[in-house]
Amino acid sequence: MQIYYLANIPSPPQGVWHLGPVPIRAYAMCIIVGILVALWMTLRRYTARGGNPDVVWDAALVVIPAGIIGGRLYHVITDNDKYFCSTCDPLDALKITNGGLGIWGAVALGAVAVWLMFKVKGIPLGPFADAVAPGLILAQAIGRLGNWFNQELYGRETTVPWALDIYYRVNESGEYAPISGRSTGEVIASVHPTFLYELLWNVAVCVFLLWAHKAFKLGHGRVFALYVAGYTAGRFVVENMRADDATLIFGLRVNVIVSVVCFVVALIVYIRLPRGQETPEEVDPARSTDAGDSVGTADSQR
């Protein structure tokens, strides 16, 4: 009796389709789906804590563009040799649909933008950050599928049964086009599917955050701190498996160093933040104001 096993994981034959003259890019679609999922989860979680759903929509208008800009800036800065060399086209730095969004920059600039908005509006950031965290890392997991379609950010060559086959892709002119082209069926490498490793890790962290939030009644931003610690722990391992070129500092990939720093900072922040959860009135200060106005109106009518 013979037993047959799956012979490697195939890459998609292409990552771009055309609807007439309009290109439909899988990478962009994965980002959009991830954003929608994160928005849906944040709405449910924030309103369950007593937050105003309008706050989520207002924050989305700020954090989404800020996150995309921050993510692209981080990528371009840390991989500047891909865009600013003698044979490079600097305008490629603007082509985000071709891949290249650094999560560190996205979270950092997005967080700063939301913090400024909440400070102006007088809304506490902690409850919102805790509501965002599980949906954010699930969105990151969905976004990793975009790397699969783009055949990018994979690991070193391997012979494990779950290796990812990278295809030779060409455009309509027959020229090599690894992102926008279509597969010829020729496998040029079998590699560690690091996109899948990170995807699965992110889903596991999402489940853990949902459980920990409920089991330990976490609040005041502690869920978000756990998100940062959990994500960076996995990213540290996966980053060391990747084979793509990266900026090195002291011989280490820049994202490895950033992962270590963020992990340590997240643990310190988690320990220093208050225990327990905020009351609905603390989550949405407008509640207490409205309640006070209602009492004052009722007293004046007596």
UniProtKB/Swiss-Prot annotation:
Pathway: Protein modification; lipoprotein biosynthesis (diacylglyceryl transfer). Residues 279-302 are annotated as: Disordered. The keyword Membrane applies. It is a multi-pass membrane protein. PANTHER family: PHOSPHATIDYLGLYCEROL--PROLIPOPROTEIN DIACYLGLYCERYL TRANSFERASE, PROLIPOPROTEIN DIACYLGLYCERYL TRANSFERASE. Keywords: Cell membrane, Membrane, Transferase, Transmembrane, Transmembrane helix. Its EC number is 2.5.1.145. GO terms for cellular component: plasma membrane. It is found in: Cell membrane. It holds the Pfam family LGT. GO terms for biological process: lipoprotein biosynthetic process. It comes from the Bacteria. Belongs to the Lgt family. One of its GO terms (molecular function) is phosphatidylglycerol-prolipoprotein diacylglyceryl transferase activity. The chain crosses the membrane at residues 19-39, 50-70, 98-118, 191-211, 249-269. The keyword Transmembrane helix applies. Its main location: membrane. It is an enzyme of class 2 (transferase). This is Phosphatidylglycerol--prolipoprotein diacylglyceryl transferase. A 1,2-diacyl-sn-glycero-3-phospho-(1'-sn-glycerol) binds at residue 144. PROSITE patterns: LGT. Catalyzes the transfer of the diacylglyceryl group from phosphatidylglycerol to the sulfhydryl group of the N-terminal cysteine of a prolipoprotein, the first step in the formation of mature lipoproteins.
